[in-house]
Amino acid sequence: MKLKELQEKLNLQLLNNEVDITSKEVSWAYCSDLLSDVIANIEANYLWITIQKHPNIIAVATLKDISGIILTNNTDADPETLSKANENDIPVF
């Protein structure tokens, strides 16, 4: 499924509008708040669901080549996180 299609179906707000989500594919989602768990278990093209908001989530997302990150519980990403997300083409919702 295309990430843009998923965004529309789930009514997700893209927090960093500088990334292009029209061509990104999502094959599955993974929910975890432990970075070590995500590194060990998430796969490429997955969508990561978490409450974490610090810049290290972008490093993990880039390392694992994931499609994007959904922040839960009305969590706002740190400005540095969104800046790094734009630099690394990682959508944050």
Q: Residue ranges of each PLM-predicted region?
A:
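Conserved catalytic and cofactor-binding micro-motifs
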Residues: 1-41
